[in-house]
Structures are given as structure tokens and as C-alpha cells.
Amino acid sequence: MHAWPDPSVPVVAGTPVPLKLFDTADQRVKEVDTTPDANGEVGMYVCGITPYDSTHLGHAATYLTFDLAQRQLLANGHKVHYAQNITDVDDPLFERAERDGVDWRELGTSQINLFRSDMEILSVIPPRDYIGAMESVDEVIAMVQQLLDAGAAYELDQGDIYASIDATEQFGYESNLDRATMEEYFAERGGDPDREGKRDPLDALIWRGHREGEPAWDSPFGPGRPGWHVECSAIATNRLGSHFAIQGGGSDLAFPHHEFSAAHAEAALKVERMAGHYVHAGMIALDGVKMSKSLGNLVFVHKLSEAGHDPSAIRLAVFAGHYREDRDFSDAILAEAEERLTRWREQLAGEVSEAEATEVVDKLRAILADDLNTPEALSLLDGAAGDCNQIIATALDGLLGVRI
């Protein structure tokens, strides 16, 4: 599946600073391991959308977070292999299509196209590999078979296959949650703890046997379709290898999704840890209330663009808070971002020496390399007195995706 057009990302002046990010598993900010993988690159996998509804600013903020991370790595001279999935076969998609009286494939295609458009508007660097679940069924089948062969999975009635949480000794390391919290989140976030016959309530579905009216693919263990978590396990490791630098997504994916996608890969491929960093972006609220379709308070990127808002201002509005924090979005915050962008354009029209401009860029690099500290980065630029040969403007484009 194709992604979206690649924005032009300029080469940034100044001294590279190693990128440090907060790792949910280790519960600390630590340097990203940029040791080249088998492809000679730094691997980054970010979980994509389930295309059953329009993507909103809360989704976009997550992808902007990892766009920032990739930009810092690129500015440091690293080659980045960025992969992302699209869960284009899943229950929420079928349920929404049935409710709206449309074909689930058509619904998925329309929402994927809208997501692509939003990412292009925001100048997000696209993944090299943009892979739908339907494209990766053979890969999932192979991983499910590996888990069965390793005794890490078992079959129940209706052709359903589950992975055992005790298949690896380290299960739970990624999210650091206690058992009670795991059970609570598992029930709330798509799990089926009450499924009869499961060895453990937390065991996760990796292959759903065929049900009437649902799409299915043939496999050695019967017709069916992939489970959500193992889909990401297979897509990520088949492109980035059994161990890669960054696994990313929203904070609501830390458990169960990222915990299980890591566990499935580790059990199947016999590795201790799938990703060096598990990085999670906070949630976005509108005027203090979490964005929800049921509340009718979603903010859509394409609507903001159609209303004439500068994409660079939208980025600045998101970057006004730290990526790990649950934070607010409002008309006032967007207006402040637009005013800030106007001030920067006026300030940077002034002239300073090359040494002064380079000093600003070096400080900007250091601030962003420290766990993507965008609030401090914006404060730094607020004090910029001018530019020299667009050294600062180029750095803003390359590091923040903000165009002066």
C-alpha cells in the first residue's frame, strides 16, 4: 500500500546531539540505540490507524511525535527505516460499516485516503513501509505457526488460536502494570477475558476462526483472519528485524497492544526484547475534555486546513505541550500558535551573525534531543533576534517541520 508524498526535509546545520527518549519499559529517559540493523538503518515502527472513522487531531499528535523523532535522527545523519501498519481488517471496521450501511472495504479505503491527506497537510515524513493487515496475512500465518510450534499458542473451538502470556518470562516488562490493572485494561481495550476455555484470562487472540459474514483467509490451521496484536508483531519484525530501535504509538497502546505485540514476536523469534525503546504519546483533549465522537468534540486536521489555518501553526499548537503529557487543544491555543508563527517570521527577517544563528541551532538540537522537549524549544525560538542565510529557518523546517 502506498503512503503519501514525502515532504522536502532540509539538511540541518550545527552539531548532532544523540537522541534520548523516555522508554516506557525502563521508565527512564535514555539514549536511542542507533546501532545500524541488518539493513544498516535505525528501525522505527509506529502503530497505524484502524480506518473506521475520520482521524482527528489526537491521532495526528501521535504521528507528529514520531515525525519529530525521525527528524532528529535524520538531522544526526542516520538512515531511518520507518514502518507503519493499517488495521484494515478488524471488528470496529465491520461494526461501523454495518451501522452505516456501507461496504467495509469502501469505508476503510475512504478513511485511509483521508488519513494520507491529513499527514501530507502536516508535512509528516511517510513510512517507507505502509502495510495493511490484508497485505500481511501470510506473514501473520507464519508467525502464528511459529507460536504453535513453540508451544506458545493453543487452539480453542471455532478455530480461534490464543497466545499464552507465560510463553515468555518477561511478559509485563513493557507496560510495567500490575495484574489487576492489566485485567482492567484488557477488558476495556478489545480483550476477551471471559472467553471460555482460555488458559489465562489475559491470553490474547492471534487468529480468529472464520465466522459467517466475515472475511477469511486459508491457513494450515483453518480459515480465519489475524488478531490485532500479532499483526503488528509480524509486520514490524519482517521489515525491521527481530530487534529494532523504537516501537511507538499513543499511551493507550502501551497495554495491551504493545505488551502483546512484543510478547508474540519475542516468543516466536526467541529474542529477549523486540524494541530498544517503547515510546508513547499522551492523549489530546479539547477544552479539557477528551476527544470523542460520542461527545461531538473531535477536531479534524482537514477541517482546520480548509478553514485557512497554516499547517505550521497546527504543528506549533501540538508542540506547545510535551509529547508525553495528556494535553489540551483549543481555539485559543491554535490562535497563540498562529501569533507565535507570525512573530517568528518577523523576528527571523532580521539579521544576526552566522555564529549567533548557529548557536541558536545548536541549542535547539540539544533541547529536542532531550526527549523532544518542544515547549523549551519554542521558548528558545521566541527569543531569536534574527537569522543569517536562513540557518535558523532551515533548522526549524528540518527539526520541527515548521516552515518560516
UniProtKB/Swiss-Prot annotation:
The cross-references to InterPro entries, in alphabetical order and at most eight, read: Cys-tRNA/MSH_ligase, Mycothiol_ligase_MshC, Rossmann-like_a/b/a_fold, tRNA-synt_1_cat_dom, tRNAsynth_Ia_anticodon-bd
Q: Where is the signal peptide?
A: none
Cofactor(s), by name: Zn(2+)
User: Is Ligase one of the keywords UniProt gives this record?
Assistant: yes
Where the record places motif 'KMSKS' region is: 290-294
One of its GO biological process terms is: cysteinyl-tRNA aminoacylation
Gene3D superfamilies given in the database record: Anticodon-binding domain of a subclass of class I aminoacyl-tRNA synthetases (1.20.120.640), HUPs (3.40.50.620)
User: Record-annotated residues binding L-cysteinyl-5'-AMP?
Assistant: C47, G48, I49, T50, T62, N85, I86, T87, W228, G250, S251, D252, I284
What this chain does, per the record? Catalyzes the ATP-dependent condensation of GlcN-Ins and L-cysteine to form L-Cys-GlcN-Ins.
Subunit architecture: Monomer.
Name the UniProt record assigns to this protein: L-cysteine:1D-myo-inositol 2-amino-2-deoxy-alpha-D-glucopyranoside ligase 1
**Which source organism does the UniProt entry give?**
Corynebacterium jeikeium (strain K411)
Gene designation: mshC1
